Amino acid sequence: MVKGPGLYTEIGKKARDLLYRDYQGDQKFSVTTYSSTGVAITTTGTNKGSLFLGDVATQVKNNNFTADVKVSTDSSLLTTLTFDEPAPGLKVIVQAKLPDHKSGKAEVQYFHDYAGISTSVGFTATPIVNFSGVVGTNGLSLGTDVAYNTESGNFKHFNAGFNFTKDDLTASLILNDKGEKLNASYYQIVSPSTVVGAEISHNFTTKENAITVGTQHALDPLTTVKARVNNAGVANALIQHEWRPKSFFTVSGEVDSKAIDKSAKVGIALALKP
């Protein structure tokens, strides 16, 4: 259903996915099965040092309605109900997490050829109200993201962003934390098998800068390698292989050049789907 400029979260997303997606510092395993009625059940386990986290997620789809229920080892139950296009261009999402009775919220998204709007409100007496809006086209868009705390009467956050796409190049500029932090990102397809990207952030309060550059290259249609490095001297690399349709095996590593005497961090992820 997504059309036009999309939602505010799309601003800078290509660069973020290139630089941060799929990098893993832990051991993660997930397997998805489907019942004869089409119900999808995904079991996930993550080993974080001496801590093991797990969850079981169930998804049921019926026409434009989707129900997701996830039970985690922290004794929480997350339920998400999605109604896709109850009216043209509209999506409604209702979510609640137990036992946290303050976590419930409803979100409405609207997609137009020249705009994308999302607004959400929590199910509490004094909720936090979120609003984000983007206007423009697939090539040029401008948006804002605002959260207002009705209890304190203050803005929780106020962000603004700009996105530009032309042919194989995408660039974005985002002002975060009520104007305290500026992020600029760049993403470019340099060949059918290779992309490069970078992200630069500046904090106006602390005067600190952060730079991350990365690349991705497809060795073959089923195998991809990625690498990134930042100005703190931390380098990451991964290799991901799709050994069967929708099933991925990923190995990633991290080395800190300023603490070379310490062992490198290695992460492994295995996702199985029928």
Swiss-Prot record:
Its main location: membrane. One of its GO terms (molecular function) is porin activity. Expressed in leaf tips, anthers and stigma. It comes from the Eukaryota. One of its GO terms (biological process) is response to bacterium. Consists mainly of membrane-spanning sided beta-sheets. This is Mitochondrial outer membrane protein porin 3. It comes from Arabidopsis thaliana (Mouse-ear cress). The gene is VDAC3.
